[in-house]
Amino acid sequence: MANKMEKMASIDAQLRQLAPAKVSEDDKLIEYDALLLDRFLDILQDLHGEDLKDSVQEVYELSAEYERKHDPKKLEELGKLITGLDAGDSIVVAKSFSHMLNLANLAEEVQIAHRRRNKLKKGDFRDESNATTESDIEETLKKLVFNMKKSPQEVFDALKNQTVDLVLTAHPTQSVRRSLLQKHARVRNCLSQLYAKDITPDDKQELDESLQREIQAAFRTDEIKRTPPTPQDEMRAGMSYFHETIWKGVPKFLRRVDTALKNIGINERVPYNAPLIQFSSWMGGDRDGNPRVTPEVTRDVCLLARMMAANLYYSQIEDLMFELSMWRCNDELRDRAEELHRNSKKDEVAKHYIEFWKKVPLNEPYRVILGHVRDKLYRTRERSRYLLAHGYSDIPEEDTFTNFDEFLEPLELCYRSLCFCGDRAIADGSLLDFLRQVSTFGLSLVRLDIRQESDRHTDVMDAITKHLEIGSYQEWSEEKRQEWLLSELVGKRPLFGPDLPTTDEIRDVLDTFHVIAELPSDNFGAYIISMATAPSDVLAVELLQRECKIKNPLRVVPLFEKLADLEAAPAALARLFSIDWYRNRIDGKQEVMIGYSDSGKDAGRFSAAWQLYKAQEELINVAQKFSVKLTMFHGRGGTVGRGGGPTHLAILSQPPDTIHGSLRVTVQGEVIEQSFGEEHLCFRTLQRFTAATLEHGMRPPSSPKPEWRALMDQMAIIATEEYRSIVFKEPRFVEYFRLATPEMEYGRMNIGSRPAKRRPSGGIETLRAIPWIFPWTQTRFHLPVWLGFGSAFKQVIEKDVKNLHMLQDMYNQWPFFRVTIDLVEMVFAKGDPGIAALNDRLLVSQNLWPFGEQLRNKYEETKKLLLQVATHKEVLEGDPYLKQRLRLRDSYITTLNVFQAYTLKRIRDPKSSVNASRLPLSRESPEATKPADELVTLNPTSEYAPGLEDTLILTMKGIAAGMQNTG
């Protein structure tokens, strides 16, 4: 009996022993987490019976014991327990741990919001322990004025002239389904409200019921996407964030900026047309290596975004009509209202409107003006809807809004008139919010970037030159290509007609340009050329835009990704700027994109980070020499291996003079949810980007000392050499990578619309950056992040012990170096070589075991050296909050790691011996109709033994949720 009682000790109690103590007075994380877990375990018992719930607890306890002492025997015990489950139970247990991790993440988010609110209530911004990830706009303005002695006017001028353009991308998109994200949002809301101070007992009871309902609904939802998403699906998923948080979040944030300005003595608001925040998208425009993004997809995505924008404005315009009921107005507005009133039909009624459906009387002039705007918005939306659904529309284009100024003008007229009549307070209400939305989102909601590989343009040019019988463009030297392209750009003759012989690929490139020509130009942002290496890459796109009759050509942005391309980028840019035709074309403005993912895959994180830093400095020097304003577009991934990390720090650690109030950065699919998933997250994201961009411009970080640069150069050579000697030159590496990680099985997740490889055959170099990072994240070994650091530190310290002191100075005084080290330290805090060792024992052939051991030794050595450089005794000693959060998650993740390793073994070796005691534990409650076995039938086409594929995918999703950075 005592034994049974012991076994029933809940995870909740276990958690309380395991978890670190409270980090601060307002720390409610353990409380939140325990409540969610208790509720979930009760639900699990109701749905699947006590035995299965006990099994989940037993698994958790073994995992928690492993976390205490890291004894590999505990992992084997865990493995035995897991392999003793039958197929249905296996899915339920894996699903339970994946679900518990998602709940732990939600508890964290609510705790972060709770701490933030408390901090704001106290007006306390001194708590620097979380300044590593925070940047408050009010705090930044005060710091600039009171500490840096900048004048309030200087700060205001800098702020209203700066632009942050956030570019939402689809790859690899969420590894959590949207159906679940919505349920998670409701769990978050219930949890926040449950802990509100003034809650009544009845409210508490109802909220608790709602909480349980949402937890159960999420658990009962199939976590696995059964079909891969199309680019249109990805676009709709991305657009849902505008609908839910970004649309209302932008004016709310800009109001907070106004308030912060007031508090430093500026009695002006940020002008509504100041482009503080802009949004762009790659969803449906990024065709680099994704054959599913066709010209038709691009057209659909633009029409969809236009329809959504018109719909969002339309849904608000009646509220504005209610608000602006005044009769006083200036002469300009009265004349316009009279003209519109005169031209409208005498007894016109619009039965499809709910409010103001009859003709508006002239003594409500603002409503007359806004009524006309509403009519046009309605037709704009309907025209886009018909074009999208049927390919044609009976609504003439001239009856709709086709350009931004035409939409803005009547709204500005209302604003001016209200101010003229002494009603500025009214003008600065909903109308100002609406104007700010129009200035931010325009008629297209987001601007779509087009991205294509440079080789595809070369193929088109080659077809043209062969058709003209002047040779093969592909075989020409760079000089000859430039000479020919420029002669054509200066000339007027058309290059080709409909008789140009084309392949499917060439037609696809040309049709994309035709779609750009056909649609309004405000739909599009930049044309990005990936794998750009030379000036001809840019000139070729300029020529194709002209040939395809694009009236307002897109700005052309070269993307430099590989290490060699980054090194050659400044020279390529200087050559471009020295061409008179090109300088006239760009009108003093150029954008360059730098890629973090591929440079990291090519040379390792250390060398990539340093090369990206130097390349930016050199590119800025080139631009200054030619008096060109350069905007850097940062293609950062969501994970550290792909250039991710806390926004505020990442921006503040950029080289001086490289941002200058103009920043473009990708917000990767896998982090969109944690950036914009909820109102307070959206607010925090906009605040961090705006504040950090302002601070970088007004208080640039100091340049590194010459001796620091010299040391970095030495270390980068060593780090690249070690990284490449293992990843590209070690003959055992590819086999080891494929066996020790779920790389081969990654494609089953149906995460994104892009194939995992650029070319179907080939080694590591053909893998996209995501399937390269994702498998290492799954095994918690994170090799692409740390490989190279250890040998670089070791060699320079062995060479001269003074170098250790220099590295410590660099860490304390140079933001770039500190951020680079801190991010790797954070990855070490999430890593566990014990899991990699288990994978080796189960999945890797014995002759590769010494190689795995060698890599794990490098991991430990690198970690030790990193802590020496940072002068830390243990990882994350400077960030108790993050440390606590990671410790809470570890036991769940470890369970999923072990589950994954044993499942992979059974998938790859169907004859592998497993426990025979496979009686189903799961018992459905009397009310339930489907036993756990039915979960196996959700995947009838699996080529593996029942339940294995789903269990594997659930572990992948769970680990991704736990690591909070997918790939």
From Swiss-Prot:
<dbReference type="Pfam" id="PF00311">
    <property type="entry name" value="PEPcase"/>
</dbReference>
<dbReference type="GO" id="GO:0048046">
    <property type="term" value="C:apoplast"/>
</dbReference>
<dbReference type="GO" id="GO:0005829">
    <property type="term" value="C:cytosol"/>
</dbReference>
<comment type="subunit">
    <text>Homotetramer.</text>
</comment>
<protein>
    <recommendedName>
        <fullName>Phosphoenolpyruvate carboxylase</fullName>
        <ecNumber>4.1.1.31</ecNumber>
    </recommendedName>
</protein>
<dbReference type="GO" id="GO:0006099">
    <property type="term" value="P:tricarboxylic acid cycle"/>
</dbReference>
<dbReference type="InterPro" id="IPR018129">
    <property type="entry name" value="PEP_COase_Lys_AS"/>
</dbReference>
<keyword id="KW-0597">Phosphoprotein</keyword>
<keyword id="KW-0120">Carbon dioxide fixation</keyword>
<dbReference type="InterPro" id="IPR015813">
    <property type="entry name" value="Pyrv/PenolPyrv_kinase-like_dom"/>
</dbReference>
<dbReference type="GO" id="GO:0008964">
    <property type="term" value="F:phosphoenolpyruvate carboxylase activity"/>
</dbReference>
<keyword id="KW-0602">Photosynthesis</keyword>
<feature type="active site">
    <location>
        <position position="171"/>
    </location>
</feature>
<dbReference type="InterPro" id="IPR021135">
    <property type="entry name" value="PEP_COase"/>
</dbReference>
<keyword id="KW-0460">Magnesium</keyword>
<dbReference type="GO" id="GO:0048366">
    <property type="term" value="P:leaf development"/>
</dbReference>
<keyword id="KW-0456">Lyase</keyword>
<feature type="region of interest" description="Disordered">
    <location>
        <begin position="915"/>
        <end position="936"/>
    </location>
</feature>
<comment type="function">
    <text>Through the carboxylation of phosphoenolpyruvate (PEP) it forms oxaloacetate, a four-carbon dicarboxylic acid source for the tricarboxylic acid cycle.</text>
</comment>
<feature type="compositionally biased region" description="Basic and acidic residues">
    <location>
        <begin position="924"/>
        <end position="933"/>
    </location>
</feature>
<dbReference type="GO" id="GO:0015979">
    <property type="term" value="P:photosynthesis"/>
</dbReference>
<feature type="active site">
    <location>
        <position position="601"/>
    </location>
</feature>
<feature type="modified residue" description="Phosphoserine">
    <location>
        <position position="10"/>
    </location>
</feature>
<dbReference type="InterPro" id="IPR033129">
    <property type="entry name" value="PEPCASE_His_AS"/>
</dbReference>
<dbReference type="InterPro" id="IPR022805">
    <property type="entry name" value="PEP_COase_bac/pln-type"/>
</dbReference>
<dbReference type="GO" id="GO:0015977">
    <property type="term" value="P:carbon fixation"/>
</dbReference>
<keyword id="KW-0021">Allosteric enzyme</keyword>
<comment type="similarity">
    <text>Belongs to the PEPCase type 1 family.</text>
</comment>
<keyword id="KW-0963">Cytoplasm</keyword>
<dbReference type="GO" id="GO:0009507">
    <property type="term" value="C:chloroplast"/>
</dbReference>
